[in-house]
């Protein structure tokens, strides 16, 4: 596969190889991984697998290959140890080993529904319970270079992939695929004119948990997708994303890859000025390390103003997005915005989101 495979697929491959070792089956250099969106299994390379502790448990190792392009998981070793659960109850028990992210210190394994489904699909059914521990030896180190901490994920990398193949959010091919997906979605006879546009893996995972539909995931090419949605006949479009991402739209930045443009704290400071913040409060925003930290600093001195600024941000995202689309044509599509915070709470919504999508939120 030229696009490479996401981390959950490599975890599932190592887990399946580990289970085969536990069952006493001979080692195979490739694990057959069943995927929810493919009729045929995918053969995924595995480095090694062996029984441990006198056959009471087994360990297998795979190495992540995300395909071409920059990706911090490249060559990341994935260790998966499996053992039978003592009580012999059916089902999987997933454990976060070293280097795997959890929800807060000592919290649950941070795993997406897709990643969990892959493991269950490839390891079950069994006539007894199976404990699966995932270990990423370099996960804690690599997590420092991600935005995991902004979402409350600590101690390592989160297993939050929502598909098998890696998508490059800044690549032109990724935009082409999103536009094809948009055309297919809006061309469906069941399409009724509403669309939730989600930004990034966390947004997609959160939207699915909230049972929002229909969904279209977009990377950094937001501007062209907004215009294409209007052209395709979307009537009501809801933008759902992390506040640290959607804030760029409030500043008129519609290709959001950080290599091209940032300006997040500058935009937030300008919105704070419009909202009437004091000079001292504006300095808190301007010199914060992130949008999340800026809101926390403001909330510490004036919680009501922090909440007002968040609502102002959601409104600005709606207004600037609507103005962007209007530059290219006269369509009836209305754009709403909902922003979530590091705790993955749908925190702020603009007036259009409240008017057109309030049933999704309440």
From Swiss-Prot:
<dbReference type="InterPro" id="IPR036074">
    <property type="entry name" value="CbiD_sf"/>
</dbReference>
<protein>
    <recommendedName>
        <fullName>Cobalt-precorrin-5B C(1)-methyltransferase</fullName>
        <ecNumber>2.1.1.195</ecNumber>
    </recommendedName>
</protein>
<keyword id="KW-0808">Transferase</keyword>
<dbReference type="GO" id="GO:0043780">
    <property type="term" value="F:cobalt-precorrin-5B C1-methyltransferase activity"/>
</dbReference>
<keyword id="KW-0949">S-adenosyl-L-methionine</keyword>
<keyword id="KW-0169">Cobalamin biosynthesis</keyword>
<comment type="pathway">
    <text>Cofactor biosynthesis; adenosylcobalamin biosynthesis; cob(II)yrinate a,c-diamide from sirohydrochlorin (anaerobic route): step 6/10.</text>
</comment>
<dbReference type="InterPro" id="IPR002748">
    <property type="entry name" value="CbiD"/>
</dbReference>
<dbReference type="GO" id="GO:0019251">
    <property type="term" value="P:anaerobic cobalamin biosynthetic process"/>
</dbReference>
<dbReference type="Pfam" id="PF01888">
    <property type="entry name" value="CbiD"/>
</dbReference>
<comment type="similarity">
    <text>Belongs to the CbiD family.</text>
</comment>
<dbReference type="GO" id="GO:0032259">
    <property type="term" value="P:methylation"/>
</dbReference>
<keyword id="KW-0489">Methyltransferase</keyword>
């Amino acid at each position: 596969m030229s696009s490479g495979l996401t981390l959950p697929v490599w975890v599932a491959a190592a887990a399946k190889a580990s289970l085969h070792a536990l069952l006493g089956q001979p080692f195979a250099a490739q694990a057959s991984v069943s995927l929810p969106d493919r009729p045929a299994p995918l053969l995924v390379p595995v480095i090694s697998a062996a029984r441990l502790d006198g056959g009471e448990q087994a360990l297998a190792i795979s190495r992540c290959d995300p395909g071409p392009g920059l990706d911090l998981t490249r060559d990341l070793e994935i260790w998966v140890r499996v053992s039978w659960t003592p009580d012999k109850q059916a089902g999987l028990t997933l454990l976060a080993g070293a280097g795997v992210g959890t929800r807060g210190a000592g919290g649950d394994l941070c795993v997406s529904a897709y990643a969990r489904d892959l493991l269950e699909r490839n390891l079950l059914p069994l006539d007894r319970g199976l404990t699966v521990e995932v270990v990423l030896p370099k996960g804690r180190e690599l997590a420092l270079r991600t935005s995991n901490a902004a979402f409350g994920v600590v101690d390592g990398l989160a297993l939050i992939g929502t598909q098998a193949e890696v998508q490059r959010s800044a690549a032109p091919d990724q935009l082409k695929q999103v536009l094809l997906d948009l055309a297919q979605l809006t061309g469906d006879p069941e399409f009724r004119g509403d669309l939730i546009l989600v930004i990034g893996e966390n947004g997609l995972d959160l939207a699915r948990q909230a049972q929002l539909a229909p969904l279209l995931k977009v990377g950094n090419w937001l501007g062209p997708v907004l215009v294409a949605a209007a052209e395709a006949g979307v009537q009501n479009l809801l933008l759902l994303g992390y506040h640290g991402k959607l804030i760029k739209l409030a500043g008129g930045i519609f290709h959001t890859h950080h290599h091209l443009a940032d300006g997040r704290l500058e935009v937030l400071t300008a919105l704070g000025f419009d909202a009437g913040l004091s000079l001292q409060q504006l300095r808190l925003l301007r010199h914060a390390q992130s949008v999340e930290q800026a809101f926390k600093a403001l909330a510490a001195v004036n919680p009501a103003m922090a909440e007002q600024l968040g609502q102002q941000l959601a409104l600005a995202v709606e207004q600037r997005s609507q103005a962007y689309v209007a530059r290219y044509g006269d369509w009836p599509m209305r754009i709403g915005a909902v922003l979530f915070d590091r705790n993955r709470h749908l925190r702020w919504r603009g007036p259009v989101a409240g008017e057109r999508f309030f049933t999704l939120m309440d």
